[in-house]
Swiss-Prot record:
Name of the protein in its database record: Large ribosomal subunit protein bL34
Spans annotated as Disordered: 1-44
Gene name tied to this protein: rpmH
HAMAP family (UniProt xref): Ribosomal_bL34
Family of this protein: Belongs to the bacterial ribosomal protein bL34 family.
Amino acid sequence: MLRTYQPKKRQRKKEHGFRKRMKTANGRKVLRRRRLKGRKVLSA
């Protein structure tokens, strides 16, 4: 059976990367929340 997680660096960056987050208002909200929470890593 095929495993569900087949990691790809490019796909990960494209979907969950910093620039993708910055593009939308909600994405920026995500980054803001993660900054306030004190996350070391904000996005993929």
